[in-house]
Amino acid sequence: MVHHWRKPKAGGKGLSLNDAVGLLKNSENDTVTLSIEREGEADLIETEVTKEKLAAIVADGKMLDDKIGYLAISEFTGLTSEQFQKAYQSLQDQGMERLIIDLRGNPGGLVTAVCDTLRQILPEGLIVYTEDTNGKREEYTCDGDTPISIPLVVLVNENTASAAEIFTGAVKDYGIGTIVGTTTFGKGIVQNTFQLSDGSVVKLTIAHYYTPLGNDIHKVGITPDVEVELPDDATSDVQLEKALEVVKGLESAE
């Protein structure tokens, strides 16, 4: 069946495509009626569609050639750890022997989310610790039940920030993987948003975080083990190509 676009109407008025999509998203009804135009047919088919909330995909994987798994994490939210676990397990079930985790463009997110994700691959020990302005220290640790034992590469760039740098820093400090790409953003602070009595909000830095070896990456970033730029005029993903080359040359810890 071929679907053709016909300018939709609401209340007898024509709508743009963007307006129609917005109407579907913002409708308070559980179901919406869609009219489908078929090629060569004058009559429209009307069907009711039940609206459901879809969970955003923030961690997804696929198998590349040579039994190399590829797992991209776009953000560390409340969904990340579970989605990572499912994607990681799926790749293992497919016979993965090497893994590339792509954190390029990942702006960070929740400290708890990145720690829950890292607990699936780190050995026993410290994941990250924070120190507030009074010097109070809070540690996040891993019991090391499921340390990764296959060759690992983590892809990063200048937009890899905050919680994504916690991930990168832990992998680097424990020596369980090789970092490939460009120097990360350099956001090593914890911030909270507070609402004032007049309704305005202010964002305050409440703590700094440090990698397992005590490195403060704020305004510095993490330098990759293998540096490779991705030029604006690149016709292929040279960073991923380098990651593939590197991961193929790594020895398994098994």
Specify the residue positions occupied by each region the protein language model found.
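Conserved functional hotspot residues or short segments at active or partner-binding sites
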Residues: 217, 239-254
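Cleft-lining beta-strand/loop regions that shape enzyme active-site pockets
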Residues: 1, 6-13, 18-187, 191-194
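Short acidic, Pro/Gly- and aromatic-enriched capping/linker segments at domain boundaries
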Residues: 196-198, 203-207
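Short, surface-exposed, low-complexity cationic segments
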Residues: 224-239
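Short, acidic, Ser/Thr-enriched surface-loop or helix-capping motifs
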Residues: 211
